[in-house]
């Protein structure tokens, strides 16, 4: 099972292959599984579950191990995505370590798994956005220098105005990106690190 683009014709305008992967069905499931692995690590560190069982739980927290067609059917019946995924995770772990299966999802709700999984997807998306904006900034800076003396019509209220250079126009775009990029990224990361899994 895979996520189809929202629009086969226009999706390429608004996203990228790495971003599609982050928000694919596999990315969604992996986010919830990463939550489950993180939960097991945190509970072991707090002495709630035996530390020796964490490796068995982590080993089963890989999205490629699961049957997405079966999950899709089960999700339709369950009404949310976490219930059938946690059942499948428990079943997979029980096959190799019945004791570890008892501690899967311990103390968590379905909403915890879904919300935390989404936050982990958003974390990956933020990293992609920052990477792409850094690349865009470098490319705009290079083009602003390259076209520092390239004349173009200035515009005001949809009319031609005093001539400007293309380099100056591009530098304006660059300035807007560079003013907002560090603030946005730092703000998002500051909120995220307080709740690191």
State each model region's role.
Residues 187-197:
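Single conserved hydrophobic/aromatic residue that forms the stacking wall/gate
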């Amino acid at each position: 099972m895979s996520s189809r683009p929202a629009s086969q014709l226009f999706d390429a305008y608004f996203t990228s292959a790495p971003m599609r992967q982050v928000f694919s069905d596999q990315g969604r499931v992996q986010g919830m599984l990463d939550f489950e692995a993180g939960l097991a690590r945190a509970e072991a560190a707090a002495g709630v579950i035996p530390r020796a069982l964490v490796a068995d739980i982590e080993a089963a927290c890989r999205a490629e191990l699961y049957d997405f067609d079966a999950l899709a059917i089960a999700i339709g019946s369950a009404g949310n995505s976490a219930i059938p995924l946690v059942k499948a995770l428990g079943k997979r772990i029980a096959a190799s370590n019945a004791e570890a299966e008892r501690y899967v999802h311990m103390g968590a709700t379905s909403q915890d798994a879904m919300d935390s999984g989404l936050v982990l997807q958003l974390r990956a998306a933020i990293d992609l956005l920052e990477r792409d904006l850094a690349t865009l900034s470098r490319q705009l800076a290079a083009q602003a220098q390259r076209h520092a003396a390239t004349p173009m019509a200035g515009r005001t209220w949809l009319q031609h105005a005093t001539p400007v250079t293309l380099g100056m126009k591009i530098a304006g775009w660059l300035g807007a990106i560079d003013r907002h990029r560090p603030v946005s990224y730092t703000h998002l990361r500051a909120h995220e690190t307080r709740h690191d899994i």
